[in-house]
């Protein structure tokens, strides 16, 4: 997508009791083949029949599926997405159809990057896509979503559409003038978190009625690039950015009951071994295995939090982004460091099936997309990584 996409990718990278770790044998976990093409900043979901669907991001308009119940598991290409290439969409299965919400991309080769508020759905039976006659109440990029039931999805977080779009309009206007471009970049990043107006409203979309509902607000500031999971009517909203380059280590917890969201006591991710504080993560993988919430990977800027505390709003200036390989687990109500992944990785797709958490694609420590598929499983108190 040219220079604007390069600036977008650069900017978005600024915006996703120790237990033993073991490499599993084939008897412990499912082995899945690599995705046909590398995937980062994509999206994915699993249906009620154990079929995983992933696509978009660096895969462009391509989508693939794999049936976990088949003896011989292979990725199959499905019909391409009609809404154009985009990154950071959210997808869930509702009423046996795959819904895709928002994202960021270019409407044509000449236009600047922009936030989308559209919704598409895919029918596995017909292998067809359809644009849904609705738009989200706010533009959706950097948002997160979890399925509440067969008809409803909860969506929250994300960047402010107008502020985000204006940044790329200004970058495009600067064109080849490096001095002007650097000025735009500095002015964009050198602001306090509150000035970015990240979305803190919680929206509920009902696919059966094709309606949106305001379900309240996050208990604190809005975030972008958070990870989220839902288990037994309890929502966990994990870390994310408070502003580009600055993460939070907070995990919000809420209960969904009688169509109402009640916020409970939050918690914090512990520091990594050898580090004084937890910077927080964006683009992390997450999912449950045998009742343990596992969070791994993602990326941050070590030292940005201290800079911000000291009054430096451009908190990540001069700091190299660090992709993470640590895995944490919420065991008996307490967060613990569990061990390390096979490699630092973030901004991929997390999908849970049974007691396995699949980590599909992602971005490695060189900023490159990968096509690998790995998994987390808890067994006998150990974290198994395959």
Swiss-Prot record:
Keyword Isomerase annotated: yes
Keywords noted in UniProt: Carbohydrate metabolism, Isomerase, Kelch repeat, Periplasm, Repeat, Signal
GO cellular component: periplasmic space
Coiled coil: none
InterPro entries assigned to the protein according to its UniProt record, in alphabetical order: Kelch-typ_b-propeller, NANM, NanM_proteobact
Residues annotated as signal peptide: 1-29
Recorded superkingdom: Bacteria
GO molecular function annotations of the record: racemase and epimerase activity, acting on carbohydrates and derivatives
Catalytic activity reported: N-acetyl-alpha-neuraminate = N-acetyl-beta-neuraminate
Compartment(s) where it occurs, according to its Swiss-Prot or TrEMBL record: Periplasm
Active site: 241 (proton acceptor)
Kelch repeat boundaries on the chain: 51-95, 97-149, 151-186, 187-232, 235-284, 306-355, 357-386
EC number, as in UniProt: 5.1.3.24
Record-stated family: Belongs to the NanM family.
HAMAP family: NanM (MF_01195)
Summary of subunit composition and partner proteins: Homodimer.
Role of this protein: Converts alpha-N-acetylneuranimic acid (Neu5Ac) to the beta-anomer, accelerating the equilibrium between the alpha- and beta-anomers. Probably facilitates sialidase-negative bacteria to compete successfully for limited amounts of extracellular Neu5Ac, which is likely taken up in the beta-anomer. In addition, the rapid removal of sialic acid from solution might be advantageous to the bacterium to damp down host responses.
Protein name per UniProt: N-acetylneuraminate epimerase
Annotated gene: nanM
């Amino acid at each position: 997508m040219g220079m604007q996409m390069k600036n977008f990718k650069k900017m978005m990278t600024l915006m996703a009791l120790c237990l033993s770790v073991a490499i599993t044998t084939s008897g412990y976990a499912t082995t899945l083949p690599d995705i046909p093409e590398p995937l980062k900043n994509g999206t994915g979901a699993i249906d009620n029949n154990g079929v995983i669907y992933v696509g978009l991001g660096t895969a462009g308009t391509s989508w693939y599926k794999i049936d976990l119940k088949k003896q011989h598991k292979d990725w199959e290409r499905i019909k391409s997405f009609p809404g154009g290439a985009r990154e950071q969409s959210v997808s869930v299965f509702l009423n046996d159809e795959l819904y895709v919400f928002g994202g960021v991309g270019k409407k044509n080769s000449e236009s600047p990057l922009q936030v989308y508020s559209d919704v598409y759905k895919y029918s596995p039976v017909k292998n067809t896509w359809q644009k849904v006659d609705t738009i989200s109440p706010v533009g959706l990029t950097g948002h997160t979503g979890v399925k509440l039931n067969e008809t409803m999805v909860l969506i929250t977080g994300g960047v402010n559409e107008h502020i985000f779009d204006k940044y790329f309009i200004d970058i495009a206007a600067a064109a080849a003038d490096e001095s002007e471009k650097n000025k735009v970049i500095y002015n964009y990043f050198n602001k306090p978190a509150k000035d970015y107006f990240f979305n803190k409203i919680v929206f509920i979309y009902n696919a059966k009625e094709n309606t949106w509902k305001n379900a309240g607000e996050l208990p604190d500031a809005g975030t972008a690039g958070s990870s989220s999971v839902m288990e037994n009517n309890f929502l966990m909203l994990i870390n994310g950015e408070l502003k580009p380059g600055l993460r939070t280590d907070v995990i919000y917890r809420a209960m969904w009951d009688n169509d109402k969201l009640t916020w409970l006591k939050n918690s914090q991710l512990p520091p990594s071994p050898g580090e004084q504080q937890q910077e927080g993560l964006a683009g992390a993988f997450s999912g449950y295995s045998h009742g343990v919430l596992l969070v791994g990977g993602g990326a941050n800027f070590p030292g940005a939090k201290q800079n911000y505390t000291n009054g430096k709003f451009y908190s990540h200036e001069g700091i190299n982004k660090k992709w993470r390989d640590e895995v944490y687990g919420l065991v008996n109500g307490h967060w613990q460091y569990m061990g390390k992944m096979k490699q630092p990785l973030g901004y991929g797709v997390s999908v849970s099936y049974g007691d396995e958490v699949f980590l599909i694609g992602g971005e490695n420590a060189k900023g490159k997309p990968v096509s690998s598929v790995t998994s987390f499983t808890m067994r006998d108190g150990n974290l198994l990584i395959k």
